[in-house]
Amino acid sequence: VRNRQSNSTGAIAALQGYSFAKLGARYPTAGGLLEYVAKGFGDGHFTGITAWLTFSANAIVTAMVAVSFGSYASAMFTGGDTAWIKIFAVLIIVAMTVVNIVGSNLVANAQTIIVYVVVGILSFFAVVTLANVNPALLAPAGYPPLSDIVSSVALTFFAFLGFGIITFTAKDLAKPAHELPRAMYLALGIATIIYIAIALGVFGTLTVEQVISSGGTALAVAAEPTLGSAGYWLMSVTALFATAGATNAGLYPVTGLSERLAETVQFPGFMARRLGGRVSAGLLIYALVCLVLALFFNLDAIASIGSAVALLIFTLITVAHLRVRTETGANTVILVVAVVAAGVVLPTFVFTTLIHEPASIVTLLVILVLSVAVDFGWKRVYANRSASRESSSSPKV
């Protein structure tokens, strides 16, 4: 079933990736995917609400990844002490925020090292576990209902969120029209192959109950039967690298995004300020939100929200793409299929989650309402300020 999920999620990600690659090649900008929404729908409330939704979803995902880092670090160094999970999560958020403050070159170098280490070790893990798979554990008899599989695609979409980050790198590329699509397709292709191989290896080694009980350390536990305790430690170190890299990737686009959205009045102007001439206020605010989420919220209870909101946003971007497809040269059929595929997964996810995890749906609604309220509230304040300035600058009679 995990293999089917990976295939389905990879297919949806590939369809959205095609849309993003075409948009990125035509509109290379620091605003990334939110710039694409503006191209299709203008700079009104729709784009503003989408911007705040993106900010919220990315913060949830970044905080959740940081907590995963904390789980592995705590398991390795403190015997799984829950207090240390939070401490390590805070440390990785702070460390990666500093990396992003130092500059894009350090971000790129750090991310390159992390990617090579993680991809290399995960490939080794996949080969070793696949060589010792128990086919009985992968038998279709153990699969859940189709509706649960379709619903889970929205959750496992979390694994592919990195390709959305690629759209924000256009400002740092020498030839974005050529390099961005290539990076998009390579990232999606490599990720899909590795995820499918890992899914087969893990679920062909452990029972579903063992995977669930292992929680965030399931990958390390799956390495033990073949590689022993050394395998557990190897995969734990890999997980530390992977989650550190994902935290870094979550923080990377915030500076450019905040500046671009403040410029178009989607975000308040103070989010574009550079404190001390260097430190992005938007980045600090985002990091603070991530810290609050990591410290004070049960992210396991709302783990699906960040992924589902991201899929919703990506679908809206592809809808926006349909409105400017003549400018990008994208294939209309592929864009329509991308929208329809996501349109099937999202309602199924909402319905299934409403039954099994009503708290997650409540959280989703709260995020939507807050995004609408913040956008309308901020733009009303901006309109009042503009009117006041115009009134004060008008010549007195």
Predicted segment positions?
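A generic transmembrane alpha-helix motif of multi-pass inner-membrane proteins
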Residues: V128, L322-V397
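Juxtamembrane helix-boundary/capping and inter-helix hinge elements in multi-pass membrane proteins
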Residues: P28-A30, K39-F46, K171-E179, L186, ...
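Helix-loop-helix junctions that connect adjacent transmembrane segments
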Residues: N3, G80-W84, T112-Y232, S236, ...
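Transmembrane helix-loop boundary segments of multi-pass membrane transporters
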Residues: V1-R2, S68-I85, N105-V115, L234-F241, ...
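Hydrophobic transmembrane alpha-helices that form the core helical bundles
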Residues: A14-I93, T97-I101, S236-R260, V292-L312
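Membrane-interface loop-to-helix entry segments
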Residues: W84-N132, Y143-P145, M184-L188, G306-I317, ...
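Hydrophobic alpha-helical transmembrane segments
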Residues: R2-N7, G48, K86-L91, Y116, ...
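TM-loop-TM module centered on a large, flexible mid-protein loop between adjacent transmembrane helices
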Residues: E35-D43, A75-G79, Y185-N248, Q266-A301
